[in-house]
A protein has these predicted regions:
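Hydrophobic beta-strand anchors of alpha/beta hydrolase catalytic cores
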Residues: 55-56, 84, 133
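N-terminal "domain-start" segment that seeds a small globular fold
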Residues: 20-47
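Short active-site neighborhood of thiol/selenol oxidoreductases, capturing the structured segment around
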Residues: 46-64
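Structural microenvironment flanking redox-active thiols in thiol-disulfide oxidoreductases
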Residues: 67-104, 116-121
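Sec-dependent bacterial lipoprotein signal peptides
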Residues: 1-18
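Thiol/disulfide oxidoreductase modules built on the thioredoxin-like
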Residues: 106, 114-158
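Active-site-proximal beta-strand/loop segments in catalytic clefts of secreted hydrolases
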Residues: 58-61, 87-90, 113-114, 148-149
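The canonical Cys-X-X-Cys-His
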Residues: 63-66, 133
Length: 163
């Protein structure tokens, strides 16, 4: 019996490790999908198909400062200097979340599924207020966490420091 329990425990552990190796898929409110992969030993986050710095932008539907942050992030996304990914913390379903993204003027992918939000929140060590932006270098290492409203120049400065 002890041997059987050990085999079952080993099998469960192997499945957990195998699951950690794969890409996690997220559906964006604009209907596109993106995939990410987190390596806990290296503390790196990769976004499939992305080879440049990126920003995870955590926001909520009723946050005025979040809406004020969006134009600067839209400009960064349009410049091609960084990929911006929005994370809507209080999602209410794909249609409602797409409406929130439109209302805030968001022109970058934004995920809101509960599992995706929890996944990204856990990776960054928790979110204790919005807006929160976490800037990653092109290798997927978090380099700066900005809590609150910041000018575009703060993001540009961080991006320049990485080059």
């Amino acid at each position: 019996m002890k041997f059987l329990n050990l085999k079952v425990a080993a099998a469960v552990f192997a499945l957990l490790l195998a699951g950690c190796d794969g890409w996690k898929h997220h559906l964006s409110s604009d209907g596109t999908s993106l995939a990410s992969k987190f390596d806990p030993s290296e503390r790196t986050l990769k976004i499939e198909g992305n080879d440049k710095p990126f920003v995870l932008f955590f926001y909520t539907s009723g946050c005025g400062a979040c809406k004020a942050q969006v134009p600067a992030l839209n400009e960064l996304q349009a410049s091609g200097d960084a990929l911006i990914i929005g994370i809507l913390g209080d999602g209410k379903g794909l249609e409602a979340d797409a409406a929130v993204a439109r209302e805030k003027g968001i022109k970058f992918p934004s995920v809101s599924g509960a599992n995706s939000v929890k996944y990204f929140e856990t990776i960054v060590g928790g979110i204790f207020g919005t807006p929160t932006s976490v800037i990653y270098d092109k290798n997927g290492k978090a380099v700066k966490k900005l809590i609150g409203l910041y000018p575009k120049s703060a993001f540009e400065t961080q991006l320049k420091l990485m080059n």
